[in-house]
UniProtKB/Swiss-Prot annotation:
Protein name: Ion-translocating oxidoreductase complex subunit C
Cofactors, names only: [4Fe-4S] cluster
Protein species of origin: Haemophilus influenzae (strain ATCC 51907 / DSM 11121 / KW20 / Rd)
Family matches, as InterPro entries: 4Fe4S_Fe-S-bd (IPR017896), 4Fe4S_Fe_S_CS (IPR017900), Ion_transpt_RnfC/RsxC (IPR010208), Nuo51_FMN-bd (IPR011538), Nuo51_FMN-bd_sf (IPR037225), RnfC_N (IPR026902)
Biased amino acid composition, Polar residues: 554-565, 587-601, 641-656, 699-712, 755-768
Binding site residues for [4Fe-4S] cluster 1: 378, 381, 384, 427
Biological processes, Gene Ontology terms: electron transport chain
Subunit composition and interactions: The complex is composed of six subunits: RnfA, RnfB, RnfC, RnfD, RnfE and RnfG.
Gene encoding the protein: rnfC
One Pfam family it belongs to: Complex1_51K
GO terms, molecular function: 4 iron, 4 sulfur cluster binding; electron transfer activity; metal ion binding
Signal peptide: none
């Protein structure tokens, strides 16, 4: 720090590297005093006119505002407010064309002036020393003052950041642009106010040295400042040589001290602060006169403007209106520049307003402006590097900008570029280098801004997560404290900790589950370890016994719940047999016809009884069909006994005994069987018909041949009917079996009446053959059955035995007759 002051106090001037001497055109505008333009009717005030963020609106559409009234309010020193340049009504707040080469829109307040130009209430002061540094900085901030030299950095923020660090305060009056003369005229005409503003700033910062630097091409301004100082030694004046860009911050500091500001750092890092002379004037007006920054001096120059000079211009005035008031000759072939020819920006739309940034409006003609020549390839001549006042390598930065290699651009210190435009001015290939560098800076800024927002979002997220975790921990701690208090309360009342007891129960339960899951084993005789299945086998045995018990219970229930209809039918059949037997014993051969009729009546009664029984029963049991067949056989035997001789009677008794045995076997079988198959009933009917036919043949002799043929046909018909019934019906209806039995009885009765005993032997043999055929049909039927029940097999065996016995007796009888 002492080095900076010592080098400055030496009085020596250092020349910076590079720089140029462009043709100077200041005389066009600096010969006329400062003037005011007519007050306009419409003003467009952008919400942001500085390097920072936009303030918050204090007004709305339709509001009436006064001159100097704040329209926005900031939350920090970098968020400067804007003020009404005159009194009037707020017509709208919407996007409007910006004073920028892009021509984009930005939020803007449209103020329609009322022509009264009425100020707000002001509180001017004479002695600024009555206020503290903080109060003065705050008033500077409230006035919306930004750097008027071109950077438009918020002045209050700049002063506050450099407070207690500044040893050398430099007031920049160099104004190195070849066309701009606003600072020159301001120093000539308002030197006293500039000096007062410098002293206000010195009061705030307390620097050891204060100096005003002015180029040697402004002798009138130098003289005016010296006259304003009146011999005071608190502020020094340094006249520097004219060279572009000596007005740049780093170059001017080097000129006065010979010290370079480190790359990427501010001048305050070496104890130096720099402000523009226009900014000093604005500070004086804000502190002493209590006037915000609502107007500034603007240079109107160029051969296209008739009335060249420097004018006081209200901020927000459309540029087209200013040029019109200054006698601008509109020509679409020649652009308008905001700023000087070296650093100025071409304006695409003249309706854009004047802002704090605009210090000059340049309207050149064909003598001052030529169309840019076509860009050519870089020839690596190094002219740009030689002329660069910041010691950069513009040709390298150009390649990095074109390839969008942002990392390399930053490595080659693109941020140190002051955009002076010298590189483009000296380039023989006519490459607009300054445009490439501005675009590259904008891209890098966007990337960093995006990264900054991402980092801020990450910080907010992490802070939120930390807060949520902290709240969760606090909640758990509260819950634990409440649970602990509850446990202590229960322990005091019951003498046992409930949580501890619950944990013990849980441990015991887990231990039991562990024991139950262990596999039991046993060791075999060979020493092998095998799983112990004793428990499993016991469980299986218990289940098997339970199933058997359930099955026996079901059988007992079925036996107990059998319908009584079957028993009634069996009783009726037994009564019929007894009656028929008595009638057979009492009647003689002479009364055969009447006995036959009586038997026939009995058969009809029995049939009607059976049919009634069938009608009264909702589901006829196959047992009834078997009983009916037995009755038919008994009646047939009785008729045969009546029509035969004494030997036939004995044979009939023998047959009756056989039928009784067969019936008893059938009844036993029926008792053992819960459901007789319908096919068995049909088989029994066929057997009965065969027996009846055989007996009839034994008792008849006169018409043996014809009767035998008739019987054969009847048997064949019966057999075919039975077979068809078996084929067409999967389960024969019991009623059909009863009908078949009745038909068999009728046929047997007719055969008994017609047959004689002459050809008994042949007829007996024929009947025997029929019985054998019937037996074979029965056996086939039994073999074709899909699932033969053991009970059915027992019934079939009993029938077979009865038939065999009957045939043996019949043969013996026939042999006796032949003898």
């Amino acid at each position: 720090m002492a080095d900076v002051l010592s080098r400055f106090n030496s009085g020596k001037l250092w020349d910076f590297k590079g720089g140029i001497h462009p043709p100077e055109m200041k005389s066009q505008s600096n010969s006329q005093p400062l003037r005011h333009l007519p007050l306009g009717t419409d003003f467009y005030i952008p919400l942001k006119q500085h390097l920072g963020t936009t303030g918050n609106l204090l007004i709305k559409e339709g509001d009436y505002v006064l001159k100097g009234q704040a329209l926005t309010k900031g939350d920090g020193l970098r968020m400067l407010p804007v003020h009404a340049p005159t009194s009037g009504t707020i017509k709208s707040i919407k996007p409007y064309v910006a004073t920028h080469p892009s021509g984009l829109d930005e939020p803007t307040i449209h103020l329609q002036a009322d022509g009264l130009d009425q100020w707000i209430e002001r509180n001017p002061i004479d002695d600024f020393s009555t206020l503290s540094s903080e109060q003065l900085i705050h008033k500077i901030y409230q006035a919306g003052i930004a750097g008027l030299g071109g950077a438009v950095f918020p002045t209050a923020a700049k002063i506050q950041s450099a407070e207690q660090k500044v040893k050398l305060l430099i007031i920049n009056g160099a104004e190195c642009e070849p066309y701009i003369t606003c600072d020159d005229r301001l120093m000539r005409e308002r030197a006293d106010e500039i000096i007062k503003g410098i002293r206000i700033l010195r009061y705030i910062l307390h620097p050891e040295k204060v100096v005003i630097a002015i180029e040697d091409n402004k002798p009138e301004a130098i003289s005016a400042i010296r006259n304003a100082l009146q011999g005071a030694n608190d502020i020094s004046i340094r006249v520097i040589p004219t060279k572009y860009p000596s007005g740049a911050t780093k170059q001017l500091i080097y000129l006065l001290t010979g010290i370079e500001v480190p790359s990427g750092e501010r001048s305050s890092s070496i104890g130096v602060l720099m402000q523009n002379v226009g900014t000093m004037f604005a500070i004086k007006r804000a502190i002493i006169n209590d006037e915000p920054l609502i107007e500034r001096v603007v240079t109107l120059t160029g051969n296209k403007i008739a009335e060249k000079g420097n004018y006081w211009v209200r901020l927000g005035t459309p540029i087209s209106q200013i040029l019109s008031d200054a006698g601008y000759q509109f020509d679409k072939h020649f652009p308008i520049f905001a700023g000087g020819p070296m650093m100025g920006l071409e304006l695409p739309n003249l309706n854009a307003p004047v802002t704090k940034l605009v210090n000059c409006l340049l309207a050149p003609d064909y003598l001052e402006y030529a169309e840019p020549e076509a860009e050519q390839a870089c020839i690596r001549c190094s002219s740009c590097s030689d002329a660069c006042p910041v010691n950069l390598m513009p040709q390298q930065l150009y390649w990095f900008a074109r390839s969008e290699d942002h990392k390399k651009s930053e490595e080659y210190a693109l941020k140190d570029c002051i955009e002076c435009g010298i590189c483009a001015y000296v380039c023989p290939s006519h490459i607009p280098l300054i445009q490439y560098f501005r675009q590259e800076k904008a891209k890098i800024w966007q990337i960093k801004e995006k990264q900054k927002k991402s980092d801020e979002a990450k910080i907010r997220f992490e802070a939120k997560q930390a807060r949520m975790e902290r709240e969760e921990q606090e909640r758990k701690a509260r819950s634990q404290r409440a649970a602990q208090a509850r446990r202590e309360e229960l322990a005091q009342t019951k003498g046992e900790d409930p949580v501890k007891a619950a944990l013990e129960r849980l441990k015991a339960k887990k231990a039991n589950e562990t024991e139950s899951t262990q596999i039991k084993t046993l060791t075999s005789e060979k020493g092998e370890v095998l799983p112990d299945n004793t428990d499993l086998m016991a469980q299986r045995k218990a289940r098997r016994l339970a199933r058997q018990q359930a099955a026996s219970q079901v059988e007992n229930q079925e036996q107990q719940t059998q319908p009584t209809n079957a028993k009634k039918a069996a009783v009726a059949a037994a009564l019929a047999r007894a009656k028929a037997k008595k009638l057979a014993q009492a009647n003689s051969t002479s009364e055969a016809i009447s006995n036959s009729q009586t038997a026939e009546n009995q058969v009809e009664k029995t049939k009607s009884a059976v049919e009634k029984t069938q009608e009264n029963s909702t589901a006829l049991d196959p047992k009834k069909a078997a009983v009916a067949a037995a009755i038919a056989r008994a009646k047939a035997k009785k008729l045969a006994q009546t029509n035969s001789t004494s030997e036939a009677i004995s044979n009939s008794q023998t047959a009756e005994n056989e039928v009784e045995k067969t019936k008893s076997a059938v009844e036993k079988t029926e008792e053992n069987s819960t459901a007789l198959d319908a096919k068995k009933a049909a088989i029994a009917a066929a057997i009965a018909r065969a027996k009846a036919k055989k007996l009839a043949q034994a008792n008849s002799a006169s018409e043996a041949i014809s009767n035998s043929q008739t019987a054969e046909n009847e048997v064949e018909k019966t057999k075919s009917a039975v077979e068809k019934t078996q084929q067409n019906s999967t389960a024969l209806d019991p009623k059909k079996a009863a009908v078949a039995a009745a038909i068999a009885r009728a046929k047997a009765k007719k055969l008994a009446q017609a047959n004689s005993t002459s050809e008994a032997i042949s007829n007996s043999q024929t009947a025997e053959n029929e019985v054998e055929k019937t037996k074979s049909a029965v056996e086939k039927t039994q073999e074709n059955s899909t699932a033969l029940d053991p009970k059915k097999a027992a019934v079939a065996a009993a029938i077979a035995r009865a038939k065999a016995k009957k045939l043996a007796k019949t043969q013996a009888t026939l042999e006796n007759n032949q003898e």
